[in-house]
């Protein structure tokens, strides 16, 4: 039995925050060798070169021999490319302290794959590919993680503004809080989608989140619907703006929260 209690005090922000546990909570069970939670990082260019880094954990007394990572890119159900490599023993990143695994050896693998003639993600055609990462031990798949991603290039210039895939794009944006009006702060995917559909009908193509890290469901829907996102992390830093806001926890939690956010 696991019991979680929320100690709610107000005012804790300058806006309606809601109270309680209003987003999904995961209790994850992993094999002793596994891919870290949120441990797959994907970057790409418009030529279709996709760089993937996967972070893994295993018992310290377990040799890395016999462990492999297989990455496979799909376009819908169509297999585009695949790559299998032996796991590295070394880890070149940082591991957030709250989820540190006792007596774990950490490793990271980076591989670059090629999507021929990629369909680019765009606000008018938000095309998404799917990456399946399999951790293999002695020939058997023991852990699988699936991520969706788009192939695109985003850049800002000081004199001409924003470009997406080399095309000049005007940002028609809004500042959007996480609550759902009369429905409150609890995450509701269909209600979020309804709101985003209405914003798109108004001509919105970009959203700045306010003023905390957005829900996973919100980010997934923006990817699927062709909406650019300026994702804001904090509104309070070390100096508080209200009596019970995030400034109370900033020194202890900011670095860890950013790691899980990114």
Regions found by a protein language model. Name each.
Residues 1-229, 252-260:
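Secreted/periplasmic carbohydrate-active enzymes, especially glycoside hydrolases
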Residues 172, 231-255:
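Active-site-adjacent "subsite" loops/lids of carbohydrate-active enzymes
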């Amino acid at each position: 039995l696991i019991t979680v209690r929320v100690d709610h005090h107000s005012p804790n922000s300058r806006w309606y925050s809601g109270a309680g546990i209003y987003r999904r909570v995961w209790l994850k069970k992993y094999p002793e060798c596994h891919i870290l939670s949120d441990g797959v990082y994907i970057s790409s260019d418009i030529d279709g070169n996709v760089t993937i880094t996967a972070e893994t954990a295993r018992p310290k007394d377990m040799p890395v021999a016999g462990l492999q990572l297989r990455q496979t890119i799909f376009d819908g159900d169509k297999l585009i490319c695949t790559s299998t490599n032996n796991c590295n023993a070394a880890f070149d990143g940082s591991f957030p302290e709250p989820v540190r695994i006792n007596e774990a050896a950490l490793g990271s693998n980076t591989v670059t794959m090629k999507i021929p003639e990629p369909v680019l993600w765009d606000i008018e055609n938000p095309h998404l590919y799917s990456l399946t990462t399999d951790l293999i031990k002695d020939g058997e798949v023991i852990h699988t993680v699936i991520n969706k991603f788009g192939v695109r290039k985003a850049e800002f210039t000081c004199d001409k503004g924003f470009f997406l895939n080399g095309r000049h794009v005007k940002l028609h944006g809004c500042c959007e809080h996480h609550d759902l009006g009369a429905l409150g702060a609890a995450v509701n995917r269909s209600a979020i989608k309804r709101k985003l559909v209405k914003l798109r009908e108004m001509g919105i193509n970009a959203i700045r989140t306010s003023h905390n890290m957005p829900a996973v469901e919100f980010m997934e829907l923006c990817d699927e619907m062709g909406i650019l996102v300026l994702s804001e992390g904090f509104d309070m830093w070390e100096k508080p703006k209200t009596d019970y806001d995030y400034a109370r926890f900033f020194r202890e939690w900011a670095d860890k929260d950013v790691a899980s956010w990114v």
